[in-house]
């Protein structure tokens, strides 16, 4: 079996701010991830949401609000058929998910996938619990 080429089409970056009481402190991680997906789809109208078959979600750390990150695809409006997986590789989570999605494409498991990374270093497990995932 010959491996197919995987192509990175586009990338977006979430905003960042000061830790602690910065402007994004109250912003939920699942909402940040959903905004990234929505922006990618807006910038690439040739990619229909139904074309996406898998979404890798990387997070660095053990924040309480990563428990429902699988909902990112639903909050972004992707079809329920889009599968997703989560990876915690500390500082390498987003790269790990990008590699796994690329491998899936190269091996023919699917044709189109997304990789998303979200983290909040200012609010780790046990630091001001509350406001979990949607």
Regions found by a protein language model. Give the residues of each.
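N-terminal amphipathic/basic leader segments beginning at the initiator methionine
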Residues: 1-17
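Short acidic, glycine/serine/threonine-rich loops at helix termini
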Residues: 19-21, 66-67, 123-130
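Phosphate/pyrophosphate-binding loops at sites that engage ATP/ADP/AMP, CoA/4′-phosphopantetheine
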Residues: 39-51
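Active-site pocket-shaping loop/turn-to-helix segments
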Residues: 16-38, 61-62, 85-99, 122
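Conserved catalytic cysteine-centered active-site region
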Residues: 59-112
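Short glycine-rich phosphate-binding loop at a beta-alpha junction
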Residues: 50-58
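Terminal domain-initiation and capping elements
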Residues: 1-2, 29, 36, 44-45, ...
């Amino acid at each position: 079996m010959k491996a197919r080429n995987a192509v990175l089409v586009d990338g977006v970056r979430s905003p960042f701010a000061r830790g602690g009481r910065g402007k994004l402190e109250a912003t939920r991680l699942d909402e940040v991830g959903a905004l990234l997906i929505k922006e990618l789809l807006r910038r690439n109208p040739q990619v229909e949401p139904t074309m996406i078959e898998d979404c890798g979600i990387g997070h660095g750390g053990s924040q309480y609000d990563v428990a429902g990150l699988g909902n990112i695809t639903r909050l972004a409006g992707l079809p329920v058929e889009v599968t997703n997986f989560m990876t915690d590789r500390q500082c390498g989570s987003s790269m790990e998910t990008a590699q796994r999605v690329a491998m899936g494409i190269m091996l023919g498991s699917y044709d189109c996938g997304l990789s998303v990374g979200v983290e909040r270093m200012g609010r780790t497990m046990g630091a001001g619990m509350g406001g979990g995932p949607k």
